[in-house]
Amino acid sequence: IVDQQFEIAQKIADAGLTPIIEPEVDINHVNKLSVEKLLVDKLQKCLKTFNNCILKLTIPDSPGLYDKLDCKKIVALSGGYSLDEACQRLKLQKNMSASFSRALSEGLTHDQTEEEFNSKIASNISKIAEAS
């Protein structure tokens, strides 16, 4: 799957855009750290021939695991973690920024008043910005 994503990313780059490659690791996988290490090995190989991309990755269990990946930017998926846990995990990483669309919307509901909605989303944005 990673090879396929890089093949498509090359086509996107050839069209003048910066591709985002998103090989997500399931946060509930019993061997998450092992899978993440396998993914890093594969990404390092792929990035040797094409690194004009942004990687959107699950926050690793091991701080700094992605530090040596050579690409334009690495952003973190909240990946199913709660907003607070995703932010705590992200703070342990040096070179990752948040891309937390699901966590950003945590606690937002259709029946909130505009004031409640604005207050909650402002709080979420603040937590994510601080973690990044």
Regions found by a protein language model. Give the residues of each.
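Short beta-strands and strand-loop turn motifs
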Residues: 21-24, 102
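Catalytic-face loop-and-helix region of soluble metabolic enzyme cores
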Residues: 50-130
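Catalytic beta/alpha-barrel core
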Residues: 1, 18, 22, 31-61, ...
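Long, contiguous binding/interaction regions
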Residues: 13
